[in-house]
């Protein structure tokens, strides 16, 4: 979902920083 305009996708999920 990284780079995709989706409100359900958080940056920390894509960057594995959660």
Swiss-Prot record:
Coiled coil: none annotated. GO terms for molecular function: acetylcholine receptor inhibitor activity; ion channel regulator activity; toxin activity. Signal peptide: none annotated. It comes from the Eukaryota. The modification Cysteine amide is found at residue 18. Expressed by the venom duct. GO terms for cellular component: extracellular region; host cell postsynaptic membrane. It is found in: Secreted. Its main location: secreted. The modification 4-hydroxyproline is found at residues 5, 11. Disulfide bonds join 1-9, 2-14, 12-18. Keywords: Acetylcholine receptor inhibiting toxin, Amidation, Disulfide bond, Hydroxylation, Ion channel impairing toxin, Neurotoxin, Postsynaptic neurotoxin, Secreted, Toxin. Changing residue 10 to P: Dissociates very rapidly from the fetal muscle receptor. The cysteine framework is IV (CC-C-C-C-C). Belongs to the conotoxin A superfamily. Alpha-conotoxins act on postsynaptic membranes, they bind to the nicotinic acetylcholine receptors (nAChR) and thus inhibit them. This toxin blocks the fetal muscle subtype (alpha-1/beta-1/gamma/delta subunits) (IC(50)=0.51 nM) with 600-fold greater affinity than the adult subtype (IC(50)=310 nM). It blocks the elicited currents completely and it dissociates very slowly from the fetal muscle receptor. This toxin causes an apparently irreversible paralysis upon intramuscular injection into gold fish. The cysteine framework differs from the previously characterized alpha-A conotoxins. It also differs in its disulfide bonding. It is why authors propose the novel nomenclature Alpha-A(1-3) conotoxin OIVA. This is Alpha-conotoxin OIVA.
